[in-house]
Protein backbone atom coordinates (compact mmCIF):
# COMPACT_ATOMS: atom_id res chain seq x y z
CA UNK A 1 0.00 0.00 0.00
CA UNK A 2 1.25 3.44 -0.93
CA UNK A 3 0.10 5.79 1.85
CA UNK A 4 2.51 8.73 1.87
CA UNK A 5 1.99 9.88 -1.69
CA UNK A 6 2.09 7.89 -4.92
CA UNK A 7 5.82 7.56 -5.60
CA UNK A 8 6.23 4.35 -3.60
CA UNK A 9 3.32 2.65 -5.34
CA UNK A 10 4.52 3.66 -8.80
CA UNK A 11 8.02 2.40 -8.04
CA UNK A 12 6.66 -0.92 -6.72
CA UNK A 13 4.47 -1.44 -9.81
CA UNK A 14 7.45 -0.76 -12.08
CA UNK A 15 9.36 -3.45 -10.18
CA UNK A 16 6.54 -5.94 -10.75
CA UNK A 17 4.87 -5.84 -7.33
CA UNK A 18 1.12 -5.61 -6.76
CA UNK A 19 -0.02 -2.29 -5.32
CA UNK A 20 -3.03 -0.66 -3.68
CA UNK A 21 -2.92 3.12 -4.06
CA UNK A 22 -4.10 5.00 -0.96
CA UNK A 23 -2.17 8.30 -0.88
CA UNK A 24 -2.94 10.65 1.99
CA UNK A 25 -2.93 13.56 -0.46
CA UNK A 26 -6.17 12.30 -2.07
CA UNK A 27 -7.63 9.48 0.02
CA UNK A 28 -7.37 10.35 3.71
CA UNK A 29 -11.02 10.91 4.58
CA UNK A 30 -10.24 12.11 8.11
CA UNK A 31 -8.98 15.27 6.40
CA UNK A 32 -11.44 18.16 6.06
CA UNK A 33 -13.81 18.20 3.08
CA UNK A 34 -13.32 21.97 2.65
CA UNK A 35 -10.48 24.47 3.21
CA UNK A 36 -12.88 26.34 5.51
CA UNK A 37 -12.03 24.12 8.46
CA UNK A 38 -13.88 26.36 10.92
CA UNK A 39 -17.18 25.46 9.25
CA UNK A 40 -16.46 21.71 9.12
CA UNK A 41 -16.80 18.88 11.65
CA UNK A 42 -13.53 18.37 13.48
CA UNK A 43 -10.80 16.56 11.53
CA UNK A 44 -7.19 15.59 12.00
CA UNK A 45 -6.06 18.39 9.67
CA UNK A 46 -5.35 18.70 5.98
CA UNK A 47 -7.95 19.08 3.26
CA UNK A 48 -9.20 16.64 0.62
CA UNK A 49 -12.08 18.03 -1.42
CA UNK A 50 -14.34 15.77 -3.46
CA UNK A 51 -12.93 17.06 -6.74
CA UNK A 52 -9.42 16.30 -5.50
CA UNK A 53 -10.46 12.72 -4.71
CA UNK A 54 -11.90 12.43 -8.22
CA UNK A 55 -8.79 13.85 -9.87
CA UNK A 56 -6.47 11.04 -8.78
CA UNK A 57 -5.04 8.84 -11.52
CA UNK A 58 -3.72 5.62 -9.93
CA UNK A 59 -1.97 4.52 -13.12
CA UNK A 60 -0.17 7.71 -14.12
CA UNK A 61 3.23 7.22 -15.80
CA UNK A 62 2.87 3.43 -16.01
CA UNK A 63 2.98 1.15 -19.04
CA UNK A 64 0.03 -1.23 -19.67
CA UNK A 65 2.05 -4.09 -18.19
CA UNK A 66 2.89 -2.09 -15.09
CA UNK A 67 -0.71 -0.89 -14.74
CA UNK A 68 -1.78 -4.51 -14.26
CA UNK A 69 -0.03 -4.41 -10.87
CA UNK A 70 -2.31 -1.62 -9.60
CA UNK A 71 -4.96 -3.75 -7.89
CA UNK A 72 -7.10 -0.79 -6.90
CA UNK A 73 -7.51 2.26 -4.70
CA UNK A 74 -8.47 2.62 -1.06
CA UNK A 75 -9.50 5.47 1.22
CA UNK A 76 -8.59 5.63 4.89
CA UNK A 77 -10.71 7.19 7.61
CA UNK A 78 -8.80 7.10 10.88
CA UNK A 79 -11.28 7.51 13.73
CA UNK A 80 -9.26 9.15 16.54
CA UNK A 81 -11.22 12.36 15.97
CA UNK A 82 -14.52 10.85 14.78
CA UNK A 83 -17.02 11.27 17.60
CA UNK A 84 -20.17 9.63 16.21
CA UNK A 85 -21.76 7.69 13.36
CA UNK A 86 -23.08 10.95 11.92
CA UNK A 87 -19.58 12.40 11.94
CA UNK A 88 -18.21 9.29 10.22
CA UNK A 89 -20.89 9.36 7.52
CA UNK A 90 -20.23 13.04 6.84
CA UNK A 91 -16.50 12.40 6.33
CA UNK A 92 -17.22 9.51 3.96
CA UNK A 93 -20.00 10.97 1.83
CA UNK A 94 -20.00 11.88 -0.98
CA UNK A 95 -16.22 11.43 -1.29
CA UNK A 96 -16.85 7.68 -1.33
CA UNK A 97 -18.75 8.09 -4.61
CA UNK A 98 -15.80 9.93 -6.15
CA UNK A 99 -13.45 7.18 -4.95
CA UNK A 100 -15.67 4.59 -6.62
CA UNK A 101 -15.35 6.34 -9.98
CA UNK A 102 -11.57 6.48 -9.60
CA UNK A 103 -11.67 2.71 -9.07
CA UNK A 104 -14.17 1.66 -11.73
CA UNK A 105 -14.36 4.29 -14.50
CA UNK A 106 -12.42 3.73 -17.70
CA UNK A 107 -10.15 6.71 -18.54
CA UNK A 108 -12.26 7.64 -21.56
CA UNK A 109 -15.39 7.93 -19.42
CA UNK A 110 -14.01 9.56 -16.30
CA UNK A 111 -14.88 13.27 -16.35
CA UNK A 112 -15.31 15.58 -13.36
CA UNK A 113 -17.93 17.85 -14.96
CA UNK A 114 -20.03 14.82 -15.96
CA UNK A 115 -19.76 13.42 -12.44
CA UNK A 116 -20.53 16.76 -10.76
CA UNK A 117 -23.46 17.75 -12.96
CA UNK A 118 -24.97 14.28 -12.97
CA UNK A 119 -24.55 13.64 -9.25
CA UNK A 120 -27.80 12.39 -7.69
CA UNK A 121 -26.50 10.21 -4.86
CA UNK A 122 -27.74 12.81 -2.38
CA UNK A 123 -31.27 11.52 -2.94
CA UNK A 124 -30.22 8.03 -1.89
CA UNK A 125 -28.26 9.37 1.09
CA UNK A 126 -31.30 11.34 2.25
CA UNK A 127 -33.63 8.38 1.74
CA UNK A 128 -31.31 6.21 3.84
CA UNK A 129 -30.97 8.86 6.54
CA UNK A 130 -27.24 9.37 6.03
CA UNK A 131 -25.43 12.56 6.94
CA UNK A 132 -23.34 13.89 4.05
CA UNK A 133 -21.38 16.94 2.89
CA UNK A 134 -22.95 19.16 0.23
CA UNK A 135 -19.88 20.89 -1.17
CA UNK A 136 -20.43 19.28 -4.58
CA UNK A 137 -23.47 21.56 -4.95
CA UNK A 138 -21.50 24.62 -3.94
CA UNK A 139 -19.54 27.18 -5.90
CA UNK A 140 -15.97 26.28 -6.76
CA UNK A 141 -13.79 29.35 -6.89
CA UNK A 142 -10.29 29.56 -8.30
CA UNK A 143 -8.13 32.56 -8.94
CA UNK A 144 -4.86 33.43 -10.60
CA UNK A 145 -2.51 36.38 -10.50
CA UNK A 146 -2.28 38.44 -13.70
CA UNK A 147 1.12 40.16 -13.36
CA UNK A 148 0.56 42.17 -16.53
CA UNK A 149 -2.38 43.94 -14.90
CA UNK A 150 -1.32 43.65 -11.27
CA UNK A 151 -4.64 41.97 -10.56
CA UNK A 152 -6.23 38.75 -9.32
CA UNK A 153 -8.62 37.03 -11.73
CA UNK A 154 -11.45 35.01 -10.16
CA UNK A 155 -13.14 32.08 -11.94
CA UNK A 156 -16.30 30.38 -10.65
CA UNK A 157 -18.03 27.10 -11.48
CA UNK A 158 -21.02 25.28 -9.99
CA UNK A 159 -23.20 22.27 -10.67
CA UNK A 160 -25.43 22.68 -13.70
CA UNK A 161 -26.43 25.82 -15.56
CA UNK A 162 -27.29 27.86 -12.48
CA UNK A 163 -26.97 31.67 -12.44
CA UNK A 164 -24.24 33.02 -10.16
CA UNK A 165 -24.35 36.59 -8.86
CA UNK A 166 -21.53 38.33 -7.01
CA UNK A 167 -20.49 41.42 -5.07
CA UNK A 168 -17.09 42.91 -4.22
CA UNK A 169 -17.98 44.81 -1.04
CA UNK A 170 -18.92 41.90 1.20
CA UNK A 171 -22.67 42.40 0.83
CA UNK A 172 -25.01 39.45 0.24
CA UNK A 173 -25.46 38.86 -3.51
CA UNK A 174 -29.01 38.94 -4.87
CA UNK A 175 -30.58 38.52 -8.29
CA UNK A 176 -29.98 42.26 -8.77
CA UNK A 177 -26.21 41.91 -8.21
CA UNK A 178 -23.84 41.56 -11.20
CA UNK A 179 -24.24 38.17 -12.85
CA UNK A 180 -21.14 36.07 -13.34
CA UNK A 181 -20.54 35.56 -17.07
CA UNK A 182 -16.79 35.01 -17.06
CA UNK A 183 -13.63 35.61 -15.03
CA UNK A 184 -13.80 38.64 -12.72
CA UNK A 185 -10.75 40.92 -12.51
CA UNK A 186 -10.00 42.23 -9.02
CA UNK A 187 -7.51 45.09 -8.89
CA UNK A 188 -7.78 46.26 -5.28
CA UNK A 189 -8.73 44.98 -1.83
CA UNK A 190 -12.14 43.34 -1.99
CA UNK A 191 -14.52 41.11 -0.06
CA UNK A 192 -15.72 38.89 -2.87
CA UNK A 193 -18.99 37.02 -2.34
CA UNK A 194 -20.94 34.90 -4.80
CA UNK A 195 -24.26 33.06 -4.66
CA UNK A 196 -25.68 30.44 -7.02
CA UNK A 197 -29.43 30.97 -7.08
CA UNK A 198 -30.94 27.50 -7.37
CA UNK A 199 -34.62 27.42 -8.22
CA UNK A 200 -36.54 25.51 -5.59
CA UNK A 201 -33.33 24.43 -3.88
CA UNK A 202 -30.68 25.50 -1.45
CA UNK A 203 -28.53 28.38 -2.68
CA UNK A 204 -24.77 27.86 -2.78
CA UNK A 205 -22.37 30.53 -1.61
CA UNK A 206 -18.68 31.35 -1.89
CA UNK A 207 -16.54 34.09 -0.37
CA UNK A 208 -12.94 35.16 -0.48
CA UNK A 209 -11.34 38.29 0.94
CA UNK A 210 -8.37 39.88 -0.81
CA UNK A 211 -6.14 42.38 1.00
CA UNK A 212 -3.92 44.08 -1.55
CA UNK A 213 -0.47 45.39 -0.68
CA UNK A 214 2.24 46.80 -2.94
CA UNK A 215 3.36 43.25 -3.80
CA UNK A 216 -0.09 41.91 -4.75
CA UNK A 217 -0.32 40.90 -8.39
CA UNK A 218 3.36 41.59 -9.03
CA UNK A 219 5.53 39.13 -11.03
CA UNK A 220 7.25 36.70 -8.66
CA UNK A 221 9.83 33.98 -9.30
CA UNK A 222 10.85 31.14 -6.99
CA UNK A 223 14.63 30.69 -6.87
CA UNK A 224 14.30 27.46 -4.87
CA UNK A 225 11.99 24.51 -5.43
CA UNK A 226 9.15 23.68 -3.01
CA UNK A 227 8.44 20.07 -2.11
CA UNK A 228 6.65 18.33 -4.98
CA UNK A 229 3.59 17.63 -2.82
CA UNK A 230 3.15 21.27 -1.81
CA UNK A 231 3.99 23.34 -4.89
CA UNK A 232 0.38 24.06 -5.93
CA UNK A 233 0.24 27.36 -7.90
CA UNK A 234 3.83 28.29 -7.16
CA UNK A 235 5.12 31.81 -6.56
CA UNK A 236 1.76 33.45 -7.29
CA UNK A 237 0.44 32.14 -3.94
CA UNK A 238 2.79 34.57 -2.21
CA UNK A 239 1.42 37.66 -3.99
CA UNK A 240 -2.29 36.90 -4.54
CA UNK A 241 -3.63 39.04 -1.69
CA UNK A 242 -5.32 36.07 0.01
CA UNK A 243 -4.35 35.30 3.60
CA UNK A 244 -4.99 31.58 3.92
CA UNK A 245 -6.51 29.69 6.80
CA UNK A 246 -4.10 27.41 8.70
CA UNK A 247 -4.75 24.28 6.61
CA UNK A 248 -1.50 23.26 4.96
CA UNK A 249 -3.10 21.04 2.30
CA UNK A 250 -5.59 23.70 1.17
CA UNK A 251 -3.49 24.61 -1.85
CA UNK A 252 -2.86 28.13 -0.55
CA UNK A 253 0.48 27.37 1.14
CA UNK A 254 3.88 26.55 -0.36
CA UNK A 255 5.78 23.82 1.49
CA UNK A 256 9.56 23.51 1.60
CA UNK A 257 11.59 20.61 2.98
CA UNK A 258 15.07 20.43 1.48
CA UNK A 259 15.53 24.09 0.54
CA UNK A 260 14.71 27.50 2.01
CA UNK A 261 12.15 29.84 0.54
CA UNK A 262 13.93 32.18 -1.88
CA UNK A 263 11.61 34.35 -3.96
CA UNK A 264 12.19 37.47 -6.05
CA UNK A 265 9.34 39.93 -6.66
CA UNK A 266 9.47 42.51 -9.44
CA UNK A 267 8.13 45.62 -7.72
CA UNK A 268 8.34 47.65 -10.92
CA UNK A 269 10.54 50.42 -9.52
CA UNK A 270 7.63 52.86 -9.65
CA UNK A 271 6.67 53.11 -5.98
CA UNK A 272 8.55 53.17 -2.71
CA UNK A 273 8.19 50.70 0.16
CA UNK A 274 9.70 50.24 3.60
CA UNK A 275 8.35 47.07 5.22
CA UNK A 276 7.90 43.39 4.38
CA UNK A 277 5.83 40.82 6.25
CA UNK A 278 5.97 37.06 5.62
CA UNK A 279 3.28 34.64 6.79
CA UNK A 280 4.32 31.14 7.82
CA UNK A 281 2.55 28.16 9.35
CA UNK A 282 3.37 25.98 12.35
CA UNK A 283 1.75 22.55 12.76
CA UNK A 284 4.24 20.66 14.89
CA UNK A 285 2.27 17.41 14.80
CA UNK A 286 2.69 17.42 11.01
CA UNK A 287 6.40 18.31 11.25
CA UNK A 288 5.80 21.89 10.10
CA UNK A 289 7.91 24.46 11.96
CA UNK A 290 8.61 28.20 11.86
CA UNK A 291 11.64 29.43 9.91
CA UNK A 292 14.96 29.97 11.67
CA UNK A 293 15.38 33.36 10.01
CA UNK A 294 13.83 35.67 7.42
CA UNK A 295 15.92 38.09 5.36
CA UNK A 296 14.95 40.85 2.91
CA UNK A 297 17.15 41.96 0.02
CA UNK A 298 16.67 44.64 -2.67
CA UNK A 299 18.22 45.26 -6.08
CA UNK A 300 17.89 47.68 -8.98
CA UNK A 301 19.05 45.20 -11.63
CA UNK A 302 17.85 41.83 -10.33
CA UNK A 303 21.41 40.52 -10.03
CA UNK A 304 23.22 42.50 -7.33
CA UNK A 305 21.21 42.41 -4.08
CA UNK A 306 21.74 44.29 -0.82
CA UNK A 307 20.40 43.03 2.50
CA UNK A 308 18.13 45.60 4.15
CA UNK A 309 16.45 43.68 7.00
CA UNK A 310 16.41 40.34 8.79
CA UNK A 311 14.87 38.65 11.78
CA UNK A 312 16.12 35.62 13.72
CA UNK A 313 13.41 33.25 14.93
CA UNK A 314 13.91 31.27 18.18
CA UNK A 315 13.70 27.48 18.04
CA UNK A 316 10.15 26.24 18.51
CA UNK A 317 9.22 24.93 21.96
CA UNK A 318 6.80 22.11 22.72
CA UNK A 319 4.33 24.50 24.34
CA UNK A 320 4.30 27.04 21.50
CA UNK A 321 0.91 27.48 19.87
CA UNK A 322 0.42 26.16 16.35
CA UNK A 323 -1.02 28.41 13.67
CA UNK A 324 0.01 31.32 11.49
CA UNK A 325 3.12 33.32 12.31
CA UNK A 326 3.85 36.74 10.83
CA UNK A 327 7.37 38.17 10.58
CA UNK A 328 7.46 41.89 9.79
CA UNK A 329 10.66 43.76 8.98
CA UNK A 330 11.15 47.48 8.45
CA UNK A 331 13.99 49.24 6.64
CA UNK A 332 14.83 52.62 5.08
CA UNK A 333 12.35 53.54 2.35
CA UNK A 334 13.41 52.31 -1.09
CA UNK A 335 12.02 52.11 -4.60
CA UNK A 336 14.34 49.31 -5.71
CA UNK A 337 12.73 47.36 -8.51
CA UNK A 338 13.51 43.88 -7.21
CA UNK A 339 12.71 42.55 -3.75
CA UNK A 340 14.00 39.21 -2.52
CA UNK A 341 12.71 37.36 0.56
CA UNK A 342 14.64 34.39 1.97
CA UNK A 343 13.26 32.25 4.81
CA UNK A 344 15.60 29.58 6.16
CA UNK A 345 14.24 26.25 7.40
CA UNK A 346 14.94 25.23 10.96
CA UNK A 347 18.22 23.28 10.96
CA UNK A 348 16.49 20.20 12.42
CA UNK A 349 13.38 19.24 14.34
CA UNK A 350 13.99 20.02 18.06
CA UNK A 351 15.05 17.36 20.55
CA UNK A 352 11.68 17.35 22.38
CA UNK A 353 9.77 16.27 19.23
CA UNK A 354 9.23 12.62 18.11
CA UNK A 355 10.93 13.55 14.82
CA UNK A 356 13.98 15.00 16.57
CA UNK A 357 16.95 15.48 14.27
CA UNK A 358 14.97 15.04 11.06
CA UNK A 359 14.18 17.80 8.61
CA UNK A 360 11.00 19.75 9.23
CA UNK A 361 8.75 21.47 6.72
CA UNK A 362 8.57 25.22 6.18
CA UNK A 363 5.19 26.46 4.93
CA UNK A 364 4.80 30.02 3.62
CA UNK A 365 1.95 32.13 2.30
CA UNK A 366 1.51 35.84 1.74
CA UNK A 367 4.29 38.40 1.39
CA UNK A 368 2.92 41.82 2.34
CA UNK A 369 4.88 44.86 1.18
CA UNK A 370 4.04 48.37 2.41
What is each PLM-predicted segment?
Residues 110-264, 281, 290:
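Short, compositionally stereotyped local motifs that mark structural "simplifiers"
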Amino acid sequence: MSWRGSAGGIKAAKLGHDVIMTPNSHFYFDYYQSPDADAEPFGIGGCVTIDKVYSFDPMADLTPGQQAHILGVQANLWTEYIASDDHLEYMLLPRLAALSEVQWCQPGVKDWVRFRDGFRMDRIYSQMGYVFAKHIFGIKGSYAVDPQKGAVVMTLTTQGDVPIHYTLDGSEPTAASPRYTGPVEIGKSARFRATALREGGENASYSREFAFSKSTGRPAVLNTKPNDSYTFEGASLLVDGYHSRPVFTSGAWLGYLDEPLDVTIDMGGEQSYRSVELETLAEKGDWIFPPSSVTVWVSDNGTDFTEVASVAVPEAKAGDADGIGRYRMQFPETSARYLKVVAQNAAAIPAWHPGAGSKGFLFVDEIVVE
